[in-house]
Protein backbone atom coordinates (compact mmCIF):
# COMPACT_ATOMS: atom_id res chain seq x y z
CA UNK A 1 0.00 0.00 0.00
CA UNK A 2 1.18 3.52 -0.74
CA UNK A 3 0.33 6.59 1.30
CA UNK A 4 1.14 9.86 -0.50
CA UNK A 5 1.22 13.25 1.21
CA UNK A 6 1.81 16.47 -0.73
CA UNK A 7 3.64 18.96 1.50
CA UNK A 8 4.64 21.45 -1.19
CA UNK A 9 3.03 23.99 -3.52
CA UNK A 10 5.78 24.57 -6.12
CA UNK A 11 4.75 21.80 -8.52
CA UNK A 12 1.22 20.73 -9.46
CA UNK A 13 0.27 17.26 -8.28
CA UNK A 14 -2.41 15.58 -10.41
CA UNK A 15 -3.97 12.12 -10.64
CA UNK A 16 -1.50 11.05 -13.32
CA UNK A 17 1.45 11.78 -11.04
CA UNK A 18 -0.19 10.06 -8.07
CA UNK A 19 -0.93 6.99 -10.20
CA UNK A 20 2.65 6.81 -11.47
CA UNK A 21 4.00 6.99 -7.91
CA UNK A 22 1.57 4.31 -6.72
CA UNK A 23 2.43 2.02 -9.65
CA UNK A 24 6.16 2.58 -9.15
CA UNK A 25 5.92 1.55 -5.49
CA UNK A 26 3.76 -1.48 -6.31
CA UNK A 27 6.03 -2.72 -9.11
CA UNK A 28 9.14 -2.25 -6.98
CA UNK A 29 7.66 -4.21 -4.08
CA UNK A 30 6.45 -6.96 -6.43
CA UNK A 31 9.85 -7.16 -8.14
CA UNK A 32 11.52 -7.54 -4.73
CA UNK A 33 8.94 -10.05 -3.44
CA UNK A 34 7.88 -7.74 -0.64
CA UNK A 35 4.63 -6.29 0.65
CA UNK A 36 3.93 -3.50 3.08
CA UNK A 37 3.14 0.15 3.53
CA UNK A 38 5.33 2.82 1.97
CA UNK A 39 4.75 6.46 2.82
CA UNK A 40 5.70 9.00 0.15
CA UNK A 41 6.08 12.68 1.06
CA UNK A 42 6.20 15.16 -1.81
CA UNK A 43 8.15 18.24 -0.74
CA UNK A 44 10.04 21.27 -2.07
CA UNK A 45 13.77 21.96 -2.04
CA UNK A 46 13.72 23.88 1.26
CA UNK A 47 11.98 21.03 3.06
CA UNK A 48 14.27 18.30 1.75
CA UNK A 49 17.35 20.46 2.40
CA UNK A 50 16.38 20.72 6.07
CA UNK A 51 16.01 16.91 6.26
CA UNK A 52 19.29 16.39 4.40
CA UNK A 53 21.04 18.74 6.84
CA UNK A 54 19.50 17.06 9.90
CA UNK A 55 19.96 13.41 8.90
CA UNK A 56 22.95 13.44 6.54
CA UNK A 57 24.81 16.60 7.61
CA UNK A 58 24.61 17.90 4.03
CA UNK A 59 23.19 21.42 3.81
CA UNK A 60 21.99 21.20 0.22
CA UNK A 61 18.72 20.14 -1.39
CA UNK A 62 18.68 16.60 -2.73
CA UNK A 63 16.17 14.73 -4.87
CA UNK A 64 15.12 11.81 -2.65
CA UNK A 65 15.67 10.58 0.90
CA UNK A 66 14.63 7.22 2.33
CA UNK A 67 13.92 6.42 5.95
CA UNK A 68 13.58 2.65 6.45
CA UNK A 69 11.43 1.55 9.38
CA UNK A 70 11.27 -2.21 8.84
CA UNK A 71 13.66 -4.34 10.86
CA UNK A 72 12.84 -7.55 9.02
CA UNK A 73 10.86 -8.85 6.05
CA UNK A 74 7.73 -9.40 8.16
CA UNK A 75 7.26 -5.74 9.13
CA UNK A 76 4.18 -4.18 7.56
CA UNK A 77 5.42 -0.57 7.51
CA UNK A 78 8.53 -0.40 5.33
CA UNK A 79 9.33 3.29 5.75
CA UNK A 80 9.15 6.77 4.32
CA UNK A 81 10.40 8.14 1.01
CA UNK A 82 10.70 11.92 0.68
CA UNK A 83 10.85 13.32 -2.86
CA UNK A 84 11.53 16.93 -3.80
CA UNK A 85 9.23 17.60 -6.75
CA UNK A 86 11.04 20.89 -7.27
CA UNK A 87 14.37 19.04 -7.66
CA UNK A 88 12.70 16.35 -9.81
CA UNK A 89 11.46 19.04 -12.22
CA UNK A 90 14.96 20.56 -12.40
CA UNK A 91 16.58 17.18 -13.04
CA UNK A 92 14.03 16.11 -15.66
CA UNK A 93 14.86 19.24 -17.63
CA UNK A 94 18.62 18.75 -17.10
CA UNK A 95 18.51 15.06 -18.16
CA UNK A 96 16.15 15.66 -21.08
CA UNK A 97 13.35 13.33 -20.06
CA UNK A 98 9.85 13.74 -18.68
CA UNK A 99 8.98 14.91 -15.20
CA UNK A 100 6.91 11.74 -14.78
CA UNK A 101 9.93 9.56 -15.58
CA UNK A 102 12.07 11.45 -13.09
CA UNK A 103 9.52 11.13 -10.29
CA UNK A 104 9.03 7.43 -11.08
CA UNK A 105 12.81 6.92 -11.00
CA UNK A 106 13.13 8.71 -7.65
CA UNK A 107 10.23 6.68 -6.26
CA UNK A 108 11.75 3.36 -7.34
CA UNK A 109 15.19 4.46 -6.13
CA UNK A 110 13.81 5.47 -2.74
CA UNK A 111 11.82 2.25 -2.27
CA UNK A 112 14.85 0.14 -3.20
CA UNK A 113 16.76 1.95 -0.44
CA UNK A 114 13.94 1.10 2.00
CA UNK A 115 14.43 -2.54 1.06
CA UNK A 116 18.14 -2.46 1.82
CA UNK A 117 19.72 -1.70 -1.54
CA UNK A 118 22.42 0.92 -1.82
CA UNK A 119 25.02 2.19 -4.27
CA UNK A 120 28.21 2.59 -2.28
CA UNK A 121 30.07 -0.09 -4.22
CA UNK A 122 30.30 -0.39 -8.02
CA UNK A 123 28.57 -3.80 -8.12
CA UNK A 124 25.76 -2.59 -5.83
CA UNK A 125 25.29 0.42 -8.10
CA UNK A 126 25.06 -1.80 -11.20
CA UNK A 127 22.47 -4.08 -9.57
CA UNK A 128 20.41 -1.15 -8.34
CA UNK A 129 20.46 0.57 -11.77
CA UNK A 130 19.37 -2.66 -13.49
CA UNK A 131 16.43 -3.00 -11.10
CA UNK A 132 15.47 0.66 -11.59
CA UNK A 133 15.55 0.42 -15.39
CA UNK A 134 13.58 -2.85 -15.40
CA UNK A 135 10.81 -1.30 -13.28
CA UNK A 136 10.77 1.95 -15.27
CA UNK A 137 10.51 -0.10 -18.46
CA UNK A 138 7.53 -1.97 -17.00
CA UNK A 139 5.96 1.44 -16.35
CA UNK A 140 6.60 2.44 -19.97
CA UNK A 141 9.06 5.12 -18.83
CA UNK A 142 12.37 3.83 -20.14
CA UNK A 143 14.99 6.24 -21.48
From Swiss-Prot:
Cofactor detail note: Binds 1 zinc ion.
Compartment(s): Cytoplasm
Keyword check for Nuclease: yes
InterPro entries assigned to the protein according to its UniProt record, in alphabetical order: MetalPrtase_cat_dom_sf_prd (IPR023091), YbeY (IPR002036), YbeY_CS (IPR020549)
A GO molecular-function annotation: metalloendopeptidase activity
Cofactor: Zn(2+)
Positions contributing to Zn(2+) binding: 109, 113, 119
Class of enzymatic activity (EC top level): hydrolase
Enzyme Commission designation: 3.1.-.-
Keywords: Cytoplasm, Endonuclease, Hydrolase, Metal-binding, Nuclease, Ribosome biogenesis, rRNA processing, Zinc
Keyword match Metal-binding: yes
Predominant localisation class: cytoplasm
A family per Pfam: YbeY
GO cellular component: cytoplasm
GO biological process, one term: rRNA processing
Family of the protein in this entry: Belongs to the endoribonuclease YbeY family.
Task of the protein: Single strand-specific metallo-endoribonuclease involved in late-stage 70S ribosome quality control and in maturation of the 3' terminus of the 16S rRNA.
Entry protein name: Endoribonuclease YbeY
Organism: Carboxydothermus hydrogenoformans (strain ATCC BAA-161 / DSM 6008 / Z-2901)
Organismal lineage: Bacteria, Bacillati, Bacillota, Clostridia, Thermoanaerobacterales
The encoding gene: ybeY
Amino acid sequence: MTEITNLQDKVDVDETLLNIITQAVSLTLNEEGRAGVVSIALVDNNYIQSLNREYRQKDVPTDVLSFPLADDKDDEVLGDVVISLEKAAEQAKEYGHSFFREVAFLTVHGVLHLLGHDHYEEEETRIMREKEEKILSALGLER
